Swiss-Prot record:
This is Set1 complex component spp1. Component of the Set1 complex composed of ash2, sdc1, set1, shg1, spp1, swd1, swd2 and swd3. The gene is spp1. It comes from Schizosaccharomyces pombe (strain 972 / ATCC 24843). One of its GO terms (molecular function) is methylated histone binding. Its main location: nucleus. Disulfide bonds: none annotated. The keyword Ribonucleoprotein does not apply. CDD domains: PHD_SPP1. The Set1 complex specifically methylates 'Lys-4' of histone H3. Residues 80-108 are annotated as: Disordered.
């Protein structure tokens, strides 16, 4: 009986020692797991909980575990103990200037003490998640809507200075060259006006749609130009027209029209000369009438103003030509000449009582000027018609392309190969 009790006590002692060894071995594993997953304060709490758990297990084994208990049951009880999850680290980070700011919840570090959010921009409002850009002078953030810069210009900004920094002289905002396509906000490629070949083609397609020139004519013009500079210079230099028109390009009706125009131009030039002589003749008659009136007033002792109209102003063209020939002796009529007074043709009636010749000087002056003006207008019309017809004759010597009118190029500008491509 005593032997049996001793064996039982030894078995219980051995069983307890094995449990303690098993717990010691598992304690290291669990402790390592908590060290890797928890912070320093959480590790201390986990060790305390683990020590208490081991003591409770040992007491439970000593008090309640019978000889049928196994190590597997105790192991499952220890493994099922709850673990403490670790807290994710929280850090604040503010990105550099000219970067897109994301969601406010992920970008702003809310203060745990007063829960105040930082204020930005000239509007002094917090980050609401809209697009902002940073100033390279004061390194503050500004809403794009507050400084009138759209978000699409983000990639075009080289450096940005807010209005205050610009006013203080810290710098000015600089930009990259924008693609010429209106709806594109990308920067251009080096040595180009476009961000891509596609946008270059799209840009000129829009230009062609707005042009009044037919697309086929533009194609011919492109074929004519070998380089971009040549295409840009089209139309800046006109074609070289021949000085003489070859007879083979002149039509018969144009010959008749040219003869008629030449005859009319000759006649109008003669009328122009006559009108000019009439104005000179009027001035000479005024001088002659003044001398005749003065002589008459001295002879008659009259102090009142007299009419002084000279009826020689009413001469027909033939009579005027004879008088001019007599005055000028065959030379062109000029104001340096003079006409002898003629008392027989001069009116010596009191000026205010002569209703027949009222304002005769003004009337004849305006009449002769109007005659000359009408003749000059007719002469210009005839000369313009002659020049247009001659221009058409010269243009028929040149190759032409029809496009809302005619674009013409001289032979010297085109090689035979280009001429063939141009006239296809």
């Amino acid at each position: 009986m005593e032997l049996t009790q001793e064996n039982t006590e030894e078995n219980e002692k051995t069983h307890v020692e094995s449990i303690v060894k098993f717990e010691d071995s598992n304690r290291g594993t669990i402790t390592d797991f908590h060290i890797e997953t928890a912070n320093n304060e959480e590790e201390k709490d986990a060790n305390v909980i683990l020590n208490k758990s081991v003591k409770m297990e040992v007491e439970e084994v000593n008090g309640h575990v019978d000889s049928s208990s196994t190590e597997t049951d105790i192991e499952m009880q220890v493994i099922q103990q709850p673990t403490i999850p670790k807290k994710p680290p929280v850090s604040a980070h503010r990105r550099g200037p000219r970067k897109h700011r994301g969601n406010a919840n992920s970008q702003l570090n809310l203060s745990t003490a007063d829960h105040q959010r930082p204020l930005y921009c000239i509007c002094q409002k917090p980050d609401d998640g809209s697009w902002m850009l940073g100033c390279d002078g004061c390194e503050d953030w500004f809403h794009g809507t507050c400084v009138n810069i759209p978000e699409s210009y983000n990639d075009l900004t080289v450096q940005y200075f807010c209005p205050k920094c610009t006013e203080e002289g810290k710098g000015i905002t600089t930009w990259k060259r924008k693609c010429r396509l209106r709806e594109c906000s990308n920067p251009t490629r080096p040595n180009s006006n476009y961000c891509s070949d596609k946008h270059g083609v799209d840009f000129f397609r829009e230009k062609v749609k707005l042009s009044t020139v037919e697309p086929s004519a533009i194609k011919n013009l492109v074929l004519f130009a070998k380089k971009r500079e040549e295409f840009q210079n089209l139309g800046t230099v006109g074609p070289t027209l021949p000085s003489q028109v070859p007879p083979e390009v002149v039509y018969n009706f144009e010959i008749e029209e040219a003869n008629r125009l030449n005859a009319e131009i000759v006649q109008l030039n003669k009328e122009k000369e006559v009108a000019s002589n009439k104005k000179i003749f009027l001035q000479l008659i005024k001088d002659s009438s003044r001398r005749a009136v003065l002589a008459y007033k001295e002879r008659e002792g009259i102090k009142k103003d007299l009419c002084g109209f000279d009826s020689r102003l009413l001469f027909n063209q033939q009579q005027m030509n004879e008088l001019w020939e007599k005055v000028s002796n065959g030379a062109p009529l000029s104001l340096d000449m003079s006409i002898d007074p003629s008392p027989e043709s001069t009116c010596f009636t009191e000026k205010r009582r002569c209703a027949k010749h009222t304002s005769w000087q003004v009337i004849f002056t305006e009449d002769f000027e109007l005659q000359e003006s009408n003749i000059l207008q007719k002469l210009n019309m005839k000369q313009t018609a002659k020049d247009v017809m001659l221009e058409h004759q010269k243009q028929r010597c040149l190759p032409g392309i029809q496009y809302d009118g005619y674009a013409r190029f001289c032979h010297e500008q085109l090689s035979p190969e280009k001429m063939a491509n141009l006239l296809k």
